[in-house]
């Protein structure tokens, strides 16, 4: 588990990790324990004793853990709310294309971002964290306005789809380089490995989109081993 970003003034925290489901049950107590431990030991942050969890699940509809998450929050709306975003990645890496074709595709997001919707979802994560009134929609799901919020992004292993979405956040809002982002994604767990190529490809497209639209220098053409 890792902290991505935080807003101490609003008491909102954005974490990434693996599935919170163990032995076909939502491991609520363990999730809270690991969140508190990670925040304190790794970032010297003391989480509030009470908070509302927004579980941003990147699992596919066919994955059993998603059904377990849905059931848990349906039965416990006072604890949190499930947000489900399907993430599939991209077959083609933008760096492998000629510059003219890559630029044309990167600027027309429907050619690369039609499924994962990173250009919409990554700013949504940032707004939830930093815009005070951005969380009003949660109030119809059991959220009490003013309660501290923990946003928890995850897939199954917490590396591939999670690395794609989290990595896009690092690039856009933390201004990390592409190489720093990849290296971090590769080493987020105890056994380092490249993130799955479909997710890495989508992250690369997001990098190129920022390069062509926002003007700040990015090293999108560089890469670590993809496999």
Describe these PLM feature segments.
Residues 1-152, 156-157, 164-227:
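Cys-dependent protein tyrosine phosphatase-like superfamily
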């Amino acid at each position: 588990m890792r902290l991505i970003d935080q807003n101490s003034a609003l008491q909102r925290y954005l974490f990434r990790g693996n599935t919170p489901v163990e032995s076909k049950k939502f491991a609520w107590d363990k999730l809270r324990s690991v969140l508190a431990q990670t925040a304190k030991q790794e970032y010297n942050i003391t989480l509030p004793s009470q908070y509302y969890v927004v579980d941003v699940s990147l699992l596919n509809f066919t994955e059993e853990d998603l059904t377990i998450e849905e059931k848990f929050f349906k039965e416990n709306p006072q604890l949190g709310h499930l947000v489900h975003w399907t993430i599939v990645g991209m077959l083609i890496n933008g760096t492998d294309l000629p510059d003219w074709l890559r630029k044309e595709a990167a600027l027309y997001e429907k050619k690369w971002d039609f499924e994962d919707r990173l250009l919409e979802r990554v700013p949504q994560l940032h707004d939830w964290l930093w815009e005070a009134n951005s969380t009003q929609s949660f109030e119809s799901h059991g959220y009490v306005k003013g309660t501290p919020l923990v946003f928890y992004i995850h897939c199954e292993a917490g590396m591939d789809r999670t690395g794609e979405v989290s990595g896009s956040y690092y690039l856009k809002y933390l201004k990390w380089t592409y190489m720093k982002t990849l290296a971090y994604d590769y080493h987020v767990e105890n056994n380092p490995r490249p993130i799955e190529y479909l997710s890495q490809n989508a992250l690369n497209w997001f990098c190129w989109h920022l390069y062509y639209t926002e003007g700040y220098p990015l090293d999108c053409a560089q890469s670590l081993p993809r496999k």
